[in-house]
Amino acid sequence: MKIVVIVRTRDESRRIGPFCESYRWADQVIVSDGGSLDDTISIASRFPNVLLRPFGERVQLANGLWRNNDSGHANHLIACANELAPDWIVYDDCDCRPNRLLREAGRDLLEGTDADFALAVRLYLWGTDQHFPHMAKPEPAHERWEPSLWAWRGPLDFWTVDKPPAYDFRVGDTVLGDVHLSHRVLDILPPLCLLHYSWDDPARVDRKVTFYRESGFIPAMAHPLTFAGPLNPLPEWAGE
C-alpha cells in the first residue's frame, strides 16, 4: 500500500524537519514550497522519502505583503500526489504532526481499514506543554472529541475551492460537509492524536496575528488566548 503525505511550506525552517521526521513511515512526503527565503528546502531535501514540488502562485495583500493562494497550493499538491497513484493521501499543515502513538500506528490503521476518509483529533498547543482542550472538543458541553480531516483514499476525486479566509473541500462537485453522512470514515481518537504547534511560540503568535491584520487577509484576527478557551497541561499520552 502506498501512502503519500503532502504539505505546503513557506519559510518553515523551524518546522519542516520535525514534520518530515514524523512521517518517515510514509512512502513519500511531497513538500510544495511557495517561495521560502530560509533553509526550508535544504532541510526537507535531507529526508530520503521527500519529493520537492515548488509552487509559484502569489496573492498580493495590503501593505506590500503576500501569501500563496491556499486552494491553488493545495490542489497543486493533490495533483502531484495523484501522479504517484497513492492508496492514501495524508494532508496537514507543516505545524501539525502525529504524536508518537499515531506515528507508530498510522500505517497499520490506514492499511487495515475499508474507510474512504481518516479523521484524527488535533490538540492545539500553547507553548510546548499546554493545550486548549475546547478546541478539540468544540461542542457546547466540551465533552466529545471532534476529529477532523487527516487522510483520504487516493482514487477519490478530492480537491479544494477558495472560501476566504480558508477553502472548502470537495469530492467531485459536492462540497464536503460531515463526511460521516456520505462516506465510510475511520475516526482516530486519543490517545492517538495530532499535535498542532501553530501557537508554540508566543512571540511568533504575535507576529502572525499582526501579519493577518496588517495584510488585510483577516483584518479582525484575534489572539488565541482570547478565543481558544482555557488551558490544560498536555496529557502524557500526547507526547512525540
Model region roles, listed by residue range:
Residues 30:
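Conserved beta-strand positions in the Rossmann-like core of class I SAM-dependent methyltransferases
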Residues 7-9, 33:
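Short beta-strand/turn micro-motifs composed of small residues
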Residues 64-79, 97-240:
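Catalytic-site signature of metal-activated, phosphate-bearing donor transferases
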Residues 33-46, 57, 93-96:
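A conserved acidic beta->alpha catalytic loop
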Residues 2-4:
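Cell-envelope/extracellular polymer assembly enzymes that use nucleotide-activated donors
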Residues 11-25:
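Short, well-formed alpha-helical segments that are part of the catalytic scaffolds
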